[in-house]
Amino acid sequence: MYGTPLPNTERDTLAPPTTANRTTAANWPVTGQRLAGSGTTLRRVNDERDDHPAPAADDHPHGESARPRPRSTDPLELGFTPRKPVPWLAPFLLISTGIRTLLAVLFGAYLDKRELQNAFGDDVFQQAGPDGGLWLDYVADLGDGFHATYSVAYLLAQPALTVDGHRLPRAQTLVMGGDQVYPSAAYEEYENRCKGPYQAALPTTPPERPTLFAVPGNHDWYDGLTAFLRLFVRSRDRNFAGWRTGQSRSYFAVELPAGWWLLGVDDQSGSYLDDPQLAYFDEVARRLGPESKVILAGPSPTWVKAADSPMAYDSIDYFIRTIIDPTGAQVRLLLSGDLHHYARYAGPNRQLITCGGGGAYLYPTHKLPERIEVPPRDTLARRASVSQPYDLVARYPDAARSRRYGWGIFARLPFRNPGFTTLLGILHTLLMLAMAGATTNWADSTDQRLFSVPLVLMVLVTVLAAVLFAKPPNASGKRHARHWLLGVGHGVAQVALATGGTWVWLALPFYGWPWPLPAVAAVVLYGPIIGLVASQLVAAYLLVAGSLGVNVNELFAGQGIEDSKSFLRLRIDPDGTLTIYPIGVDRVSRDWQVNPDQSATASWLTPKAPLTPRLTEPPIVLP
C-alpha cells in the first residue's frame, strides 16, 4: 500500500507548446463513431493515422456475456466464486504479501512492462454524452470481499440513483482508480473479486454503451501488470462486463466536454514515470491550451503520504510541472484511491480527493493531517513547484465514527483472522513450555528436550517479531523513535503475558503428568485460550499504537470493516461546470436475492434490504 517514489530525471527543458502546434478538437483527425443508441461518443483521436480502429458499434452488442441469467447463487451459474474479505493478518498471507512486496522492490524494474507498451497504440480518446455534457464515475480499491464490492458495483450499474434529492443517471464513463484486486494480481482473483461482481451488476452492455478506463495500483503491479493488461488493455473483445474497455496502455488520456481532460498516470507503485509514458503525455500536451482544465488520476494520494515521506509527491509534481504547466492548462482536480476512505483537501485553485471506498477494508480518517503543504517544503527535488497550503475540508466516515471503528479491533481481530490467533497460540505455547522447562527442569528425557525450545531464543524471537510488526521507518521516511519503543514495549508485554501464563500453568496439575501428556494438554487446552488472550493484547497494542500514528493500517486491516464505502459521480455540463457528487454507503448489503426474470441489463442479484446511498458532503462545484 505504501511506496516511496524516486525522483524523475529533471526534464525542465521541455519547451512549452506553441500556438502553432496546438490544434483544436474541431480540426483533429478523428477515428471511431457514435455508439449504438443515443449514448456516449467514444472516439480515438490520432495524428493523421488510425492504426487501432475503434470496434464497430455492433461488435458485441450485449457485452461479453452470453451466460443465461442465474437462478441461484451457485458459482457454476454465476460464473465466479464470491469471496470473503481478505484476512489481512493471516500468517500465510502476511508472509506471501511480504515476499511479493520484497520481490516488487528488488525486481520491479525487471518486471516493468511499461517500456514494452511503447509498441501498443498511443490513442487519445474523446468522451461526450448526447447532450454535450458527460456523467463520469470514479471508484477505487474495489476487488475485495463480495458484499462490499458488489454493493458498490450494484449502485454504479443502476440506470439512475436518487441521492439526497439529486437524480444522478448512470455514468457514461467509469474510471477505476487502482487496486482492482486483492491480495495479489492473480487472474483468478480478478475474475472472482472484481470482474465477476461487476458482471453480475451490469451483465450486458446497455444502449448508452458506457466506457471503462483503469489505473493500476500497487496490488495490480504484483505480477508486473500481466493480468491487468490482459483484462483492461486488449485489442480484441474490449468488454468488461457491461462496460467497454477503451485504453491501449496502462495509462490514458481522454478529452472530455467543454475543455476538460482526464489523464490517468501509472507510476509503478510510486517509483517513477517511464520514458514512453512521458513521451505519450508530451504528445497529449500538444493538444492542451490555456483554456484546458485537467483531472489527473493517479494510483495513490501522494499529497497525504508526503507528510511522512517527502519524496512521495515528486513524480506527480514533476508530471504537472513539466508536462501540463508549460501548456497553460490548469490541473483543477487530483483523484486517487489507495487509502480506503473519502477525503478532500481544498487549495487555492485545486481539489485533492482520495476516494478508495470501492470495496476494500475501511482505512481511518481521524489520523489525517488537518493541513498539508503540496509539494512539501522538505522535498529533495531540485526544482519542485511552489508549495501551496491545502486544508482538509471533508472526510468520510467522520473522525468520531472513525475512532469508534478503531475500538472494534477487540471483537473483530480474533474472528476475522483465526490463523493469526492460532499463530499466537502456537508461539505462546512454545514460550510457556520453554519457561516451564527452565523453571522446573522437567525436560529430562531426550523426547522432552526435542520439544523444549531454548528460553532465550523464544524471548528474542517474540521481541523481534513485535518490533518488526511495528514497522520502524526506513531511511527513505521520517524516523520516529515511537515505532521502536512501541515495538519493544509490545514484545515485552507478550513475554510478560507468557510469564503469567506459565505461572498459571504450573499451578495446574498438567505439568506433573507423564510425558508426552503435558505437551498434549498444552496444545489442546493452553494453546487456544492463550491465543485468544494474546490476540486481545495485540488488539490493545494496535489501539494504543494507532493513536500515536503507528500500525494505523494494521488496526483497520485486522478488522476488515466492510461498511462506509464510497465512490464519486461527476457531471460535466456543456458550459464547462464540473459538479462532484461524493456518495457514501453507510452499510453495505449482506443479504442478496437472485433476479432471474428481468431485462438483460438488470443486475443478477439485488439486495433484500435497499441500499441507501447518501452524499458525504454537499456537491462540489468547479466552474
Where are these regions (language model features)?
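Active-site neighborhood of phospho(di)ester-bond hydrolases with catalytic His/Asp-centered motifs
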Residues: 139-140, 173-179, 208-218, 265, ...
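Acidic, histidine-bearing metal-coordination/catalytic regions of metal-dependent phosphoesterases
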Residues: 2-3, 7-8, 14, 22, ...
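Conserved beta-sheet core of the metallophosphoesterase superfamily
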Residues: 214, 311-376, 532-565
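Membrane-interfacial catalytic/cofactor-binding modules of polytopic membrane enzymes
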Residues: 244-246, 263-268, 273-276, 305, ...
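A short, polar/proline- and glycine-enriched secondary-structure boundary/capping micro-motif
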Residues: 273-276, 363-365, 589-595
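Active-site environment of divalent metal-dependent phosphoester hydrolases
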Residues: 145-147, 182-185, 216-225, 270-273, ...
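Active-site-proximal segments of metal-dependent phosphoesterases and phosphodiesterases across multiple
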Residues: 147, 269-277, 289-332, 409, ...
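Active-site-proximal beta-strand elements of phosphoester/diester hydrolases
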Residues: 133-144, 259-269, 295-299, 350-358, ...
